[in-house]
Regions:
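N-terminal Sec-pathway targeting helices
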Residues: 1-16
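Hydrophobic alpha-helical membrane-insertion segments, chiefly the h-region
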Residues: 14-24
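N-terminal module-boundary/linker segments of secreted carbohydrate-active enzymes
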Residues: 25-85, 98
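N-terminal hydrophobic targeting/anchoring segments and the immediately downstream early-domain regions
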Residues: 86-90
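Extracellular-facing segments of soluble proteins and assemblies that are Gly/Ser/Thr-biased and enriched
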Residues: 93-173
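Short loop/turn segments at secondary-structure transitions that flank enzyme active sites
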Residues: 114, 205, 221
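...with weaker cross-activation on analogous glycine-rich loops/strands in unrelated enzymes
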Residues: 144-211
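Low-complexity, Gly/Ser/Thr/Pro-rich intrinsically disordered linker/tail segments
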Residues: 212-264
Length: 264
């Protein structure tokens, strides 16, 4: 009788755990910044993983210091209202949009430019437009001039120009600050738009050598920069696990080829 009672209690506990997990997947796992992290670097790595600095440690530190909006914050559109598919958002970056043209590639350029501007390297801020012409920032330390430069840049640059300007990187060498990017012209078929997302953090398991990474993106129409949620992870973690030998990756809902990883 005691054995039957123990089995019953065990089955009851398993059922309660299953129900709790189901409720969490349906509700808790879609909550933005569920643990109220203050900045991107507060997001814990997968168990056994350690953050890496990459070839540009200062850029890695800058990205990890990006402030996050509080628990439950929604991705808002520049024009007002909230974006669709909020479940794709793991955490909203607390950085006000500059214009309705600040979309996917623009976000990648902005984060790079913000890093250089905040580091006092204003002379290093330059990007190419869709015709291959270099657009240089020449406004010095003026924040107003810097933001005006970015607004103008958004109108002449795109996923096409960014994919041509950045240098290719092997998946195995992925680092913070890298960009997954493709232009519509590179994809025959129904693809009307290109897309770009930035790798904002990378962690490595020293025992296995495996890597995981965080992504941040903007999108069309212009919306808050946000850390992407990995929908393939059963716990809805924002970390994407890297398969170095993969020919392609599905990052949230966007497909990328292995050779579409780039770096500044």
């Amino acid at each position: 009788m005691k054995v039957i009672k123990r089995i019953f209690v065990l089955l009851l506990l398993v059922a309660l755990l299953a129900i709790s997990y189901g409720v969490w997947v349906l509700y808790g796992s879609t909550t933005s910044n569920p643990h109220n992290y203050r900045c991107l670097g507060d997001i814990p790595t997968p168990y056994g993983y350690q953050r890496i600095m990459g070839d540009d440690p200062d850029f890695s530190v800058f990205l990890r210091s990006l402030p996050l909006k509080g628990k439950g914050a929604e991705v808002e559109l520049f024009t007002g209202g909230t974006a669709r598919f909020q479940s794709l958002n793991y955490a909203v970056v607390n950085l006000p949009l500059l214009s309705n043209a600040e979309q996917c590639a623009d976000v990648c350029m902005r984060l790079r430019a913000e890093y250089l501007y905040n580091k006092g390297l204003c002379g290093s801020i330059h990007f190419k437009d869709v015709n291959g012409k270099t657009i240089r920032y020449q406004g010095g330390s003026s924040r107003k001039a810097f933001e005006r430069y970015l607004r103008n840049l958004y109108g002449v640059a795109s996923t096409f120009s960014l994919s041509r300007e950045l240098k290719q990187r092997r998946l195995a060498d992925i680092q913070p600050g890298d960009v997954f990017v493709y232009a519509a012209v590179d994809r025959p078929g129904p693809h009307k738009y290109g897309h770009a997302v930035m790798v904002v953090d990378v962690a490595r398991n020293p025992r296995t050598g495996k890597k995981a990474f965080l992504l941040a993106e903007g999108n069309t129409p212009a919306r808050n920069i946000h850390v992407m949620r990995n929908l393939e992870n059963p716990f809805r973690s924002p970390w994407f696990m890297l398969d170095e030998d993969a020919e392609g990756l599905i990052l949230s809902v966007f497909p990328y080829k292995a050779n579409e990883l780039r770096h500044f």
